[in-house]
Amino acid sequence: MTSTLPKASQPDPSSLQPSARPGAHGRFGRFGGQYVPETLMPALAELEQSAAQAWADPAFTGRLNHLLKTYVGRATPLYEAERLTAHYRRDDGGPRIWLKREDLNHTGAHKINNALGQALLALRMGKKRIIAETGAGQHGVATATVCARFGLDCVIYMGAEDMRRQALNVFRMRLLGATVAPVTAGSATLKDATSEAIRDWVTNVETTHYILGSVAGPHPYPMLVRDFHAVIGQEAKQQCEEAFGRLPDVLMACVGGGSNAMGLFHPFVQDTSVRLIGVEAAGDGVNTPRHAATITEGRAGVLHGAMSLLLQDSDGQVQEAHSISAGLDYPGVGPEHSYLKEIGRAEYAAVTDEQALDGLRLVSELEGIIPALETAHAFAWLEQLCPTLPQGCEVVINCSGRGDKDVNTVAEKLGDKL
């Protein structure tokens, strides 16, 4: 189900301030901020200053762009999904569907864009120990990868339940030389891994850099992570011009914390002719307690250092999230997504576990691409979206990751034994 503001609440495009920098105290409207222990304030200030200096330094941006090309494998292609397009074609036409192939990056997902950028920042700040949280394991693998590349010590915090679901990625991280620390608190998933990583950072802030994996957390992380992922949308904008001579009509991406979606959306936010659609995890259904549809069903609150929309009970306590996808299994969302929803610039929908599985199977069978379960949520929304779109509409979906890591989960759900 789509969650949008009433027509009267649609924003004046001239009032949008997507230029990348948030307002005072790291705010996107009322969202964002720095709700952290005093111990971390100097580290956050250092990170913000170092990032600003780095982006202004041609040596830094030159090295980053060189590694994005030669190590990560960018630019990723914009692929015309001809059979998926044909599947949704109607007698009166229908949209043309394109995939931004972030699954073709080194390590198999978009996460490497941010991990690489932050590792270079850590080197610039003289930090030799890296920590990170991970849910599906893709951010953990990306972080372990860049730590191996630059000779940095690496500790990845991962919920015990996610370690069970993503055993392949756990092995990959360890093979890359990282220590994977299981977290058994709470639901033993991404929220709990993030909390444990923050505790580590508070204790070891002088020597350690925390490579936060999404556009969440205290300022400057939502801005920092978004800026490292904005290469996705920057490439897509140029590729759309080359492929069909104009901007796309619709951009769509899955949303957990929201980094892949923000990376795609951000370069288009001021292009108000382009619809931005984020797809969340409805789990067993948004009418049940077992879902992760934070924007669709959440209320404003504070989690992991920032104010954003959260899943909460009637007492304001953060609720446990559920999704078949470990990467979307999070009760919060990046504050800029909350802001884009509140001002009406972006739309957000939610699809169930079963719908996501159907989307994964459809794309696998029609395009020969096995997407990650996270990405499959965006594909699943095509079922509701496409009948509403006119002939000639150009739709770009961020194929944020490949599905190798999810084969065991999918097989289990489909009743197959490996």
From Swiss-Prot:
Q: Which PANTHER family match?
A: TRYPTOPHAN SYNTHASE (PTHR48077:SF3), TRYPTOPHAN SYNTHASE-RELATED (PTHR48077)
The record's PROSITE patterns line, in alphabetical order, gives: TRP_SYNTHASE_BETA
Q: Which organism is it from?
A: Synechococcus sp. (strain CC9902)
Family note: Belongs to the TrpB family.
Using the UniProt annotation, give all residue ranges assigned to the region (Disordered). 1-28
| Cofactors, names only | pyridoxal 5'-phosphate
Which gene does this sequence derive from? Answer: trpB
Extract one GO molecular function annotation from the record.
tryptophan synthase activity
Write down what this protein is called: Tryptophan synthase beta chain
Write down the HAMAP family for this protein, in alphabetical order.
Trp_synth_beta
InterPro entries found in the cross-reference section: Trp_synth_b_CS (IPR006653), Trp_synth_beta (IPR006654), Trp_synth_beta/beta-like (IPR023026), TrpB-like_PALP (IPR001926), TrpB-like_PALP_sf (IPR036052)
Q: Which domain of life is it from?
A: Bacteria
Q: Biased-composition ranges for Polar residues?
A: 1-18
- Protein's job: The beta subunit is responsible for the synthesis of L-tryptophan from indole and L-serine.
Task: Show the Gene3D superfamilies listed in the entry.
Answer: 3.40.50.1100
Q: How does it assemble?
A: Tetramer of two alpha and two beta chains.
